[in-house]
């Protein structure tokens, strides 16, 4: 981080996650890249991407986490891609979790309901993504610069934190947001 950059006034170009990701990866405004709101299933067909430009400049390019790429396994310049699909496959192989899925907590994907996650913290998607990112950092090629895009689903509905965090805040009054 000594040679890194902090953006203290960075703002999303769009409040919708898919459109914002497209703008970040293409450098284009939502209007220019063709998505100004939430639209699933719209193909990503761009000649240039941030990851592709960095890869072509010699960077190791790795994405871990949520992508919203279409088709889902599209690399868009990333040499390595680890997604929610990989997490789902990993979760299905965990001992004692036959048939358990990440949404078995019963809260729909974009619901405003909240309840504790049914999985132990070490098996929750965000924990798994973090572990995968740390594994990359610990085993990457130290002779090459890198670009790691680590993208979590949370905070995003459904609101299903680990039990310990749910219990920590459930009965607490929250201050009004500063505007």
Roles of regions detected by a PLM:
Residues 1-179:
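Formylglycine-dependent sulfatase
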């Amino acid at each position: 981080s000594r040679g890194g950059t902090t953006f203290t006034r960075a703002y999303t170009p769009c409040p919708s996650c898919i459109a914002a990701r497209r703008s970040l990866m293409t450098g284009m405004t939502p209007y220019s890249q063709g998505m100004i709101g939430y639209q699933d299933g719209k193909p990503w067909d761009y000649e240039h991407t941030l990851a592709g430009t960095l890869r072509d400049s010699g960077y190791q390019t790795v994405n871990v986490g949520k992508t919203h790429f279409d088709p889902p396994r599209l690399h868009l310049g990333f040499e390595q891609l680890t997604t929610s699909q990989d997490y789902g496959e990993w979760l299905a192989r965990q001992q004692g979790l036959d048939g358990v899925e990440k949404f078995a907590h019963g809260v729909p994907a974009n619901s405003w309901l909240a309840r504790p996650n049914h999985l132990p913290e070490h098996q929750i998607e965000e924990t798994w993504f973090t572990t995968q990112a740390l594994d990359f950092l610990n085993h990457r090629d130290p002779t090459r610069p890198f670009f790691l895009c680590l993208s979590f689903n949370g905070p995003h509905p459904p609101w299903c934190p680990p039990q310990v965090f749910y219990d920590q805040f459930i009965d607490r009054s929250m201050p009004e947001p500063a505007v």
